[in-house]
Amino acid sequence: MEWLTGLPRVAGLFVLTALAEIVGCYLPWLVLREGRSLWLLAPTTLALALFAWLLTLHPAAAGRTYAAYGGVYVTVAIAWLWLVDGVRPDRWDALGCALALAGMAVIMLAPRS
């Protein structure tokens, strides 16, 4: 668990990775659901490429990184719901985030040889 000393770095990477993925999915949603300009697909490509690159910077094995990242993704997506979509999360959203983050903590903080 030597990576634990870099926990703030890993947490920051997870948040940046989630933001890149959400932007990469939100922009095409705007094009397809809201009739926005097709030009939004250009930054979509950049956001998804950034997302893929950021995943390579995580210190754990790829499968474990993806699994743990899911907990942070859920939390960032709910924050996006509130800050971008203007929908205030309810207690069930908060509970879901807490459970997802607890699962992420089990995966990332478990003692391994």
Swiss-Prot record:
Coiled-coil spans are: none
Gene Ontology terms, cellular component aspect?
plasma membrane
Q: How does it sit in the membrane?
A: Multi-pass membrane protein
Superkingdom classification of source: Bacteria
* Protein's cellular compartments: Cell inner membrane
The record lists the membrane-crossing segments as 12-32, 37-57, 67-87, 91-111
Q: Which UniProt keywords apply?
A: Cell inner membrane, Cell membrane, Membrane, Transmembrane, Transmembrane helix
Entry's family note? Belongs to the UPF0060 family.
Q: Which HAMAP family match?
A: UPF0060 (MF_00010)
By its UniProt entry, which NCBIfam families does this protein fall under?
PRK02237.1
Q: Which PANTHER family match?
A: UPF0060 MEMBRANE PROTEIN YNFA (PTHR36116:SF1)
UniProt name for this protein: UPF0060 membrane protein CV_3485
Organism classification: Bacteria, Pseudomonadati, Pseudomonadota, Betaproteobacteria, Neisseriales
